[in-house]
Amino acid sequence: MDKKITIAQIKEVAQQAYDLYKTNTDGKNADYIPYLANINKNLFGISICLLNGQTIEVGDSEYRFGIESVSKVHTAILVLRQYGAKELLEKIGADATGLPFNSIIAILLENDHPSTPLVNAGAITACSMVKPVGDSKQKWDAIVANITDLCGSAPQLIDELYKSESATNFNNRSIAWLLKNYNRIYDDPDMSLDLYTRQCSLGITAKQLSVAAATVANLGLNPVTKKQVFDAELSPKITSMISTVGFYEHTGDWLYTSGIPAKTGVGGGVMGVLPGQFGISAFAPPIDQAGNSVKAQLAIKYVMNKLGLNVFNGHRVTIVD
């Protein structure tokens, strides 16, 4: 079935979503990371990046917030770029754990691999794999350059967030050294954890994340900069991982109700990929008990359902002026 949607319709629906949910008071800021606890809880932004490079923005789409776990997608892409899909599967894996994002039990249950680069254990392993192994500065430069390629503009380290996370990341320290015990980390554990903590502390905007999502939706071609960031055949690999674990143990419910693969972070950001159509991101600091932004979820679901879009419905969708 063919379906046409106008850019005006997308703008209208995005504005409706913003107006509908901007006063929602459900959820609360992440309180286990001091910096995040103090962010203005009323911030709310939506951005959609079309594959022609046009962005549709509503609300606080240019506010720079902590990227947190959404960064796992970016570093997974970097590992895919440097090693290829086969080696990522062998060294990390692509299975959903069905457990919370910071689970230590998942490592004990599947000690032969960390399961997926989109949970903490796999993301720390991914940071350990980033080349050149053994050189923290060059690894960090590669991580930032990759995010810049995907987003079309550079992120900025939020130093206060980095210090806040570094002082409270006891669980992740346990994960890093447990991975070492099972020979599933490929560089110094403390260095790898520090890189992971730093990448989670990068400041990003909803607009930047929508461009990154559109780059994935556009088979690795950044629609804004026109740069081929990664090989087209890697796009289904990363999208499939987002589909299965983007919302951790609640991914099934999310995909069932929204129809779009998306990755979430406790900083309040959600980044969704609709292959061949657009990237969408929403941001609002209050999160639910699973660590997912309440308003960002509601907004993206509204846009998808109101426009009748779903990654599984088989429609041939054309977006027109």
UniProtKB/Swiss-Prot annotation:
Statement: the UniProt record of this protein carries the keyword Hydrolase: yes
GO BP of this protein: glutamate biosynthetic process; glutamine catabolic process
Pfam families: Glutaminase
GO MF annotation terms: glutaminase activity
Catalytic EC class: hydrolase
Binding site for substrate: S69, N120, E165, N172, Y196, Y248, V266
Catalyzed reaction equations: L-glutamine + H2O = L-glutamate + NH4(+)
EC annotation from Swiss-Prot or TrEMBL: 3.5.1.2
Matches recorded under Gene3D superfamilies: DD-peptidase/beta-lactamase superfamily
Coiled coil: none
UniProt xrefs under HAMAP family: Glutaminase (MF_00313)
Family as reported in the entry's similarity comment: Belongs to the glutaminase family.
Subunit structure and binding partners: Homotetramer.
Protein name: Glutaminase
Gene: glsA
